Amino acid sequence: MKLPKHLKFAAGAGGAFLFGILFGWVMFPAILKGQLKKEMALSKKTDVRKMWETIPFALNFKVYLYNYTNPEEVQKGGVPIIKEVGPYHFDEWKEKVEIEDHEEDDTITYKKRDTFYFNQEKSGPGLTGEEVITMPHVFMLAMATVVSREKPAMMNMIGKAINGIFDNPADVFIRVKALDIMFRGTMINCARTEFAPKAVCTALKKEAVNGLVMEPNNQFRFSLFGSRNGTIDPHVVTVKRGIKNVMDVGQVVAIDGKPQQDVWRDHCNEYQGTDGTVFPPFLTEHDRLQSFSGDLCRSFKPWYQKKSFYRGITTHRYIANIGDFANDPELNCFCDGPCPPKGLMDLMKCMKAPMYASMPHFLDSDPELLKNVKGLNPDVNEHGIEIDFEPISGTPMVANQRVQFNMQLLKHDKVELLNNLPDTIVPLFWIDEGLALNKTFVNMLKFQLFYPKKAVGVIKWLLVTFGGFGLIGCTIYHYKDRIMSFASSPGSAAVTKVKPEEVEQKDVSVIGQPQEPAKINM
């Protein structure tokens, strides 16, 4: 039996409709998800693995130093007045070395190496790195603070050691060129024969002090970042590859072979989250991301803020802060004794240095911190931590991880140089480590993910629309044709015109004479 043309068309339209639904809403998402699971894992064949090993572009590493304009007043107990100088822009190249895969537990181990190059063109107007900055002497104050906390009976000796090592300084401030304090280093003279400075310098040689590099002739070179520039970090990091489960990709499971830290208390020692260079795909607005920072010995848990856009791609913006350790039960285990004010994190146990981490300009911190220093202006847009993720692939498109480092001006009666200082926490510098994917990598993401996704989106709606309207049209045509056929078939109850029949006229004969009607007399 030969089908009518409209039924053939209806079959085609129905097929297009069903294929549009099945392919567009069922098959393609499953194919895309399966492909992403393969591509986002840290297997040796993927592009993600290559970028994870060596980021093919430089990150933006910006340093803002605080210049103290009234050191003489501060030395006498006055309120510090500071002026921000920066940014000093450095191109930061990140790579992972000594990489080993472990098939049995789907992990990979590595060490990291960061290299910095000063970029004067991208630095603040007129900044060359040769500007002289006046700031609290980090090394001097750190030495005094550590002894006051751990061996207070030795504070008399520390006063003599300071005078010997730093040549009888007039105050606790250092006047130093910006690039020297950041990377090149400033000299610490340990070629002393007096007992106090010699004892301190001997202790320095035995311990690995952050920022301190040994030089010939009993000299040390101290800088904020120089010791990590171009050197391999000694710590061995173990993370999940995500081949067996892509949602585990990049998760830190051990450092130096230890499944957790021994720095803090309770769950604060756990490694929670990724290593910060790769994140799982398929993010939703309800997901809480986590990443572990080795520099601060803790995990951060950014939360979703809003939708945003970057170079035509819809992203999810996540934000974070340092936290309130005293009032947040999850963070209380970071406190060794009384918790610091809101927005401050004591790094003594992590860095072995009496430093405090905070948001730049004390953003989201205890208001009292701002009252103790003049010259700070916190701004959430300039000083907040924010990361824009492409949610399907979990790719960070734009990121600004900002943190400020602070130190307490130690007031101590047993050291003449310290006995008049204001007992307050003051800022030293803050950094902004960020990235913004350039056009090349954004286009790569568009061609590999978004253009196929958009094409399928257009095709599926065309198929569904064509199929839907085709089915409706064929249905209407089919039933209209049936009605007309039924109306014209024999034996139907249809009403037809009947032509009246002509009647033949016939002669009628009358028998007898016609009579008139009888008259009635009234």
Curated annotation (Swiss-Prot):
Keywords noted in UniProt: Cell membrane, Disulfide bond, Glycoprotein, Membrane, Olfaction, Receptor, Sensory transduction, Transmembrane, Transmembrane helix
GO process annotations (BP): sensory perception of smell
Transmembrane segments: 12-32, 456-476
Cytoplasm as UniProt keyword: no
InterPro entries: CD36_fam (IPR002159)
Disulfide-bond pairs as recorded: 268-333, 297-350, 335-339
Membrane topology type: Multi-pass membrane protein
Ranges of the Cytoplasmic topological domain: 1-11, 477-522
Extracellular side stretches: 33-455
GO cellular component terms, A-Z: cytoplasm; plasma membrane
Domain of life: Eukaryota
Localization (cell): Cell membrane
Glycosylation sites: 67, 229, 438
GO molecular function terms attached to this record: scavenger receptor activity
Pfam families: CD36
Function according to Swiss-Prot or TrEMBL: Plays an olfactory role that is not restricted to pheromone sensitivity.
PANTHER family associated with the record: SCAVENGER RECEPTOR CLASS B TYPE-1 SR-B1, SENSORY NEURON MEMBRANE PROTEIN 1
Family listed: Belongs to the CD36 family.
Official protein name in the record: Sensory neuron membrane protein 1
Organism: Plutella xylostella
Gene: SNMP1
